[in-house]
């Protein structure tokens, strides 16, 4: 049986990208004493935050003792779902995330809020002595990310970002092939996300804040604006005040693997072009089409995204192509393949 100490050790390995298998899924069932429970609190219950909590709860050592959301309807429904999963009522329900951070019984905080909140909440959790699982992207700027890294180091906390593909074996296998050198010299990496499921967002008028929603808390560090449903819950990601569009939604996953595969960090130069070409008059602010070229010493990484179109490169709607002189390795969430270079 995995002990509390083992859990923290495995979490550290995952955060460092050193563990291949998600420990949530493969935990060995067994009896766990109350003092050995890892007590988790979730901030932001609507989307990926609750998916993350469900993954945590697959480990019998994890106990959810707190949920926080600014929307009463979301908070109450997630509390009921959590009770159905665990058979226990969640002890603490909050609308103010600071009260969750102040709860001394919590060991681990899951940050599942919109992107503009990640930095403040992750840093506060570290200051309070909590370990943190933070949804991607880590932050909305390089400086935010630097602050977050410094906080994790200063307070000696275990922090993992939601780059969950790092724990998926077939991605690791694909990178092992890239690193083997069998592709020959890699001249470019094509990274793409064509998301046909993303609809145009019709313009809607501002309206009064619905009952049960603490909108001022939702805005937090973002500029003060009237309530508009287009900017709230899932579709926040298409507005610059809170996020960066498809680039920071999908790009953060896929570009991570471009850097990992090529064993690099920052490029020498970046050039980008795009705009609202597919849906020029809808409510979204972020580009629905974008191409970006990152130039390194002897290769490039090319990002390409489109909203409302599914037909991307290599017959896939997302993925990476490591283009080498001997062939191209293509990988996405369904698997990977090597396409040999044709010899005339």
Please annotate each region the language model reported.
Residues 131-133, 139-212:
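A contiguous active-site-proximal alpha/beta segment in oxidoreductase catalytic domains
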Residues 173, 185, 190-192, 196-238, ...:
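Contiguous beta-strand/loop segments that form the cofactor/metal-binding neighborhood of enzyme cores
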